[in-house]
Structures are given as structure tokens and as C-alpha cells.
């Protein structure tokens, strides 16, 4: 007689084993109709799974995040159902849930076109609208293998052979004549899967290994209702308009090419952005009393072995040989910073020692994962490492948190999600050390009034960490900042200091990044601002345009005056109509468009309009320069107003 305890604390007793769907029906027909699955003692289960003992039960519907994830997973199976009807020879690989949707990797000789994808989507919708039941069967390993062998599903057989124990009982989900294998849970009926769209097709190697066959990966998105689907597609349209690769080309900021995959060729205006970002962070380093250092680009393999990186990261490291020695281009800066710390005897009085570098790093990312500035092989980190005593950890972490929030606020990012990753199962040090480390991070977060989520067991083996994820104007999440405690690397590389009692002690090392990769952060900013950078960051802050040749010398004078005062100004003396010039520089997103005719020249003025079309009227050149300089010094996010 199972007793079911619901989230509100109420209990329901049943004479026999029941399913989540039975419990929902006992509560009411509306809930039974909406029930997708159940959370039984914290674990998601299919709505049809029997409950035989006393449990805590939460009934999952599409109003729950888990419910939406479940219907997305079922849409992946629906895709399998449809593609097997249209191309029966297709071999199905894997079809997981991803952010906002799902994908399925398929082995199909026919190369799918846009027209094929549109027809596939129609077939999926036609199948879903029949509202057929999804039938779950738990079978023996052998029955599952026999099922897929009879259907020629070689990838499903490989998953069974390589990933599932013969003692296990896999779950098969039957979508009419189509059968798939999955941990589940899945929707009980396809009435929940009416609001989806197939988005694109890409190549993907089986198991992510380039030695294996290239499959076709079909991406889709799925939502609980029509309104949510439409809102998501609208966000995607806006994101496409803001795509940093598209805007980067329009504004002539940078380019990538095949001869240097994942490496950025910065053009003049793009490099101006990069340097301004670096200048801003360098100013922050001064405010928070960091030393700035520069380490070598590559170091002997021996050092990477001592640091432990060779064992963990060698596949992602670029290597070269010279004079019978093997070198690795650095994928990160920390071992180099320990070498600088180790030069000369350090005392406890020298701590904390804050060491920062704009470190040029390289990682051999898979070519298929490269994506504009967001995922590159060569990148610059705003990296820092703080060497301190254990007693100083909380204060130093608190300083890092302040720096992160100060920095993000300058760019207009205020919606920051903070996560604290705690001790993993495999770790160095004793529980007392981890207790102190985790408490220090929690105290630092509390001191800064920061709400945070704890991720149990997600810390590195050498220490807990804090992650900062910012949300942009399209509500996309970007994990940028990290504060990571490290109790291992200093000891591995022989870092010590003389303590107050004259003993030799190993410092705690704090890895700190705020922007992360400057390239990636610039990609985020390009999309956040849609290329309309704040004045302080804009490559060209003002462009001065003449109406006729008579004003050419005056334009030169105005531009020189602006440049002498630190304003990035340019001129446009082309023999074109002024309306044409204004349109062109508006498309270049220049913050201020300054027009001079005879009257402006006579009165030593400029006629000012913003890139958004706001007419600020005629302003004396000295006054305008002072106004813009103030904007720049304040790093204002807004343009001047009427």
C-alpha cells in the first residue's frame, strides 16, 4: 500500500502499485491530462512507471522546466520516426536534448537539403497530430540488441555493446512502428509535441572522433506552446541580425581564413576595439593593485609534465621540436606565473601577490567547434593569479568579486548568475581544508551580498571555484568570469614563501579571469550592442564631413583639434552629397556625425547628429570636444542627448 507524499505535504494512500499518471488522475482529470512525467524521490520517471513503495512525488507538466526538456527529448524520437518513414535506410545514432531544443545524428547517404528538412518537419507534425501513445517497454540487453540488429541499426548496437552492461535492462520507446532506446523519461502521448521547428543540418563525427564516419546532425527546437515557440524564433531572428560574424564583416573589424583556422586577423577598427578593452582592464588592474607580467609563448614539455597539464591537456596543446627538445605552446598562463613567483625568496610580508597578464594562449580546438570570435584556437586571456596565505583567501576572493561586478557594470551587464562549485569525489587535501576553502568563498560572496547557486561535486580536484555568467539583451547566458582556488599547482612547481615563524610554506593560488578570452568577450559585445559601441569603445568616435570643398581646411583643423584631445576622429572630404555621407557613416555605427558648411566654419561650430538620427544642433567645437571627452572618461553607455 504505497503512500504518496505530494509537494504540498499532503498524502495519498493506494491499495496497489500506482503510476504517476494514476496519482494525477486521482487528484483530478485536468492534472491527468497535463501529466508528462513524475519526479519520484527526486528522480525523473516516466508517467507509466509503477510506484510500489512510499515515495515523495511531484507531477511534471509542461509548465515545469523538466517537462519542456522531456517533450524536447520526445521530439528527437519523433524526428527519428519521421525520417525512417521518409528514408527507411537511415541509421539512427544519438538524439539528445540541448539548450532550447534537440538534435539527432543520422547516417544517411542522401545529403539533406533545405527542402528535405521542410518536408521532414511536415511529416513530424502530421505524425504528432495523430496524438499517438508512446509505449515504453523495459527489456533484456539481448532483446534490445536483437531488436536493433533486425533493423540494421548499427549505431544502437554499438551503444549497447560499448556503453550498456549486459546485466542492464534498457528501455525501448515505441512510436508506432518506430522503436528507439533511451533512459527517458518521455511524454506518454504525442499531443505534447506539436510546437517545434527543425532549424538546420550540420556535419558531426560519430562519437566526436574525426577518425569515424561523418554523420548528418539535424537540429530542432521545441516548446510547450505556440507562443513560446514564436518568441524563441523571434529571438533567433534578432540574434541573426546581431551575429558578430556578420557585423564584423560589415564594420571591417576582423576576418578569419582557412590558412589559420581559429586565429583572428584583426583589422584597424577591430584592433582599436581590442586595445581599448585591454586599456580598460589594465586600468582596473591598477585600481586593484596587480602587477602586470608577460610570460613566454611556449615552454619545454618537462615543465608542462611537472604542472600536470601534459597528462590532462596534451591533446589540446600545439607542440614543436627544436634541438632535440619538445616544446608546447601555452594553453594557459598559470605555470608561467608560478615560475615568476619562484624567482627570489618570498616572505609572508610579500603576500598577497597579485600577478596579471594579457596572456596569448592557443588550444587545438576541434575544427568543427570553431565559431567566429566565440570559439577560437588563438586567444588572449585577461588572466591573473593571486598568491596568498590561507588566511587571506576570503579577502582576496572578495576583491575579485568586486572587480568582476565593477567591470561587467561598465558594459551594462547587471544580470549575473553566480555558481559555487564544491568538492568533487576525487580530490586532494583533507575535508578540513575543503571546509575552510568552501567557507572562505561563501563568506566572500556573502560579504558582497551575492546570491549564488551551489553545484555539489563540480569543483576541480585541486579546489572549489566560483563562476560568473552574464545575460545579454537576448537573455543568452555567457559564462565569462571565474575565481578558482588551487591547492595543488604551487606545490607541484615548488612555490614557497617564508612564514612568520621562518618555516617554508606553500601559498594558496587563486586563478582569476574576468572577461575570459578578450576575443570572445568582444564577440559578446558586438552582439550586445549590435555594432553600436559606446563612445568610449567605438573605433571612430566622430566623423567630420564637409558640404563643399570650401570647408576642407576647416574639417582638417577640427579633426586635428579632436585628435589632440584624445578623441578618435576621422574626416570625409569626398565629393559626394552630404546625405550619402551621413547614410554611409550611420551604417558604420559612428556615434557622432558632424557636418560643416560655410556657416559652421564661420562660427567655429559643427552641426551634430547621432548615429540614431538625433539632431543635436550646432555646437562650438571646443564645447563638443569637452562633452565627448567627459563621455569617454565616464565610459558612458549613452550618447549625448538634445
UniProtKB/Swiss-Prot annotation:
Belongs to the class-II aminoacyl-tRNA synthetase family. Residues 1-61 form the TGS domain. Its EC number is 6.1.1.3. Catalyzes the attachment of threonine to tRNA(Thr) in a two-step reaction: L-threonine is first activated by ATP to form Thr-AMP and then transferred to the acceptor end of tRNA(Thr). Also edits incorrectly charged L-seryl-tRNA(Thr). It catalyses: tRNA(Thr) + L-threonine + ATP = L-threonyl-tRNA(Thr) + AMP + diphosphate + H(+). Keywords: Aminoacyl-tRNA synthetase, ATP-binding, Cytoplasm, Ligase, Metal-binding, Nucleotide-binding, Protein biosynthesis, RNA-binding, tRNA-binding, Zinc. The keyword Cell membrane does not apply. Homodimer. Zn(2+) binds at residues 334, 385, 511. It comes from Shewanella loihica (strain ATCC BAA-1088 / PV-4). NCBIfam families: thrS (TIGR00418). It comes from the Bacteria. One of its GO terms (biological process) is threonyl-tRNA aminoacylation. It is found in: Cytoplasm. PANTHER family: THREONINE--TRNA LIGASE, CHLOROPLASTIC_MITOCHONDRIAL 2, THREONINE-TRNA LIGASE. Its cofactor is Zn(2+). Binds 1 zinc ion per subunit. CDD domains: TGS_ThrRS (cd01667), ThrRS_anticodon (cd00860), ThrRS_core (cd00771). This is Threonine--tRNA ligase. Gene3D superfamilies: 3.10.20.30, 3.30.54.20, Anticodon-binding domain (3.40.50.800), Bira Bifunctional Protein, Domain 2 (3.30.930.10), Threonyl-trna Synthetase, Chain A, domain 2 (3.30.980.10). One of its GO terms (cellular component) is cytosol. Its main location: cytoplasm. The keyword rRNA processing does not apply.
